[in-house]
Regions:
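Flexible, solvent-exposed loop/hinge segments and secondary-structure transition points
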Residues: 31-153, 159-164, 168-196
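Positively charged n-region of N-terminal signal peptides that target proteins for export
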Residues: 10-16
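Intrinsically disordered, low-complexity segments enriched in Ser/Pro/Gly/Ala and basic residues
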Residues: 5-6, 18
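Sec-dependent N-terminal signal peptides
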Residues: 16-24
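Cleavable N-terminal signal peptides
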Residues: 19, 29-30
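Compositionally biased, low-complexity segments
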Residues: 2-3, 15, 64
Length: 196
């Protein structure tokens, strides 16, 4: 009888140890997706040939309303910082995926996305959005008249909300770039008029 009890305890111990090992593997996989993947300085060095200027776009009510619609949340900030060299701009967004923020940076040139990077990923799932093969889909995307992307971005199983977050950030970057370029044209026209 003791031998039967002893073997039963042995089976239960092995089952318990296996459970802990599997739990550890799942936890490590989850934690492996969380982390800092690129610094802002590194991103700017990658997308600009010369050191970009840090600039500020002051947001009026109309721009804030547009951003609120695009980002699907109330955007209450009065200004947004961006980086610029010539016609190229870079924008950083800190948007919620499923539960936690995803810090992403998007470079735009000539009204097209030229680079997307995940600076910091804090979600426990959906980390595949940081992969180059996924982010490359955004390159050359432009903004339609209805503020949508001109390219279809393929989703990732288990990362639906992270993908939507990056889509919204990409649209916001394109819209903000468009606003900055329009402001430049208006300022240049005013300068030309005042010179006459």
């Amino acid at each position: 009888m003791l031998a039967g009890v002893s073997s039963q305890i042995g089976v239960e111990m092995r089952y318990l140890m296996l459970s802990f090992l599997l739990l550890g593997a799942v936890t490590n996989t989850t934690l492996a997706q969380i982390g800092v993947y690129q610094t802002l300085d590194s991103f700017n060095a990658e997308v600009f040939t010369t050191s970009p200027d840090s600039e500020t776009l002051w947001l009026n009510d109309d721009i804030r309303d547009q951003l609120s619609t695009i980002l699907n949340r109330i955007y209450g900030q009065l200004r947004i910082r961006y980086w610029r060299s010539g016609e190229r701009t870079a924008w950083v967004f800190n948007e919620i995926g499923k539960e936690r923020p995803i810090t992403n940076a998007i470079a735009v040139d000539g009204g097209k996305i030229v680079h997307v990077s995940i600076l910091e990923y804090r979600e426990s799932r959906g980390g595949e959005v940081k992969l180059e093969s996924f982010r490359r889909q955004f390159v050359d995307a432009q903004l339609t008249e209805k503020d949508k992307l001109t390219k279809k971005i393929n989703g990732i199983t288990g990362a639906t909300l992270s993908v939507k977050t990056l889509n919204r950030s990409a649209i916001a970057a394109l819209k903000l770039h468009e606003i900055v370029m329009q402001n430049d044209r208006l300022e240049n026209n005013e300068d030309e008029i005042s010179l006459r």
